[in-house]
Curated annotation (Swiss-Prot):
Residues 9-23 have a biased composition (Basic and acidic residues). Residues 1-23 are annotated as: Disordered. The keyword Coiled coil applies. Keywords: Coiled coil, Membrane, Transmembrane, Transmembrane helix. It comes from Takifugu rubripes (Japanese pufferfish). Residues 9-30 form a coiled coil. One of its GO terms (cellular component) is membrane. It comes from the Eukaryota. This is Single-pass membrane and coiled-coil domain-containing protein 4. The chain crosses the membrane at residues 32-52. The gene is smco4. Belongs to the SMCO4 family. It is a single-pass membrane protein.
Length: 59
């Protein structure tokens, strides 16, 4: 039967499996890329605040 343009295609088991795999890969990427990047940015901010407010810099 011909697929109408306005209706979405039904998701097959293969499509569902691929979608689940893509979501799992995205979760792994968050753990390996995003978290270390955020940690480095936070450490840089902490260092700059420390360097700007230490007593030796004021005098």
């Amino acid at each position: 039967m011909r697929q109408l343009k306005g209706k979405p295609k039904k998701e097959t088991s293969k499509d569902k499996r691929e979608r689940k795999q893509a979501m799992q890969d995205a979760r792994k990427q968050v753990a390996t890329v995003v978290l270390p990047t955020v940690a480095v940015v936070v450490l840089l901010i902490v260092f700059f605040v420390y360097a700007a407010t230490r007593p030796g810099a004021i005098a």
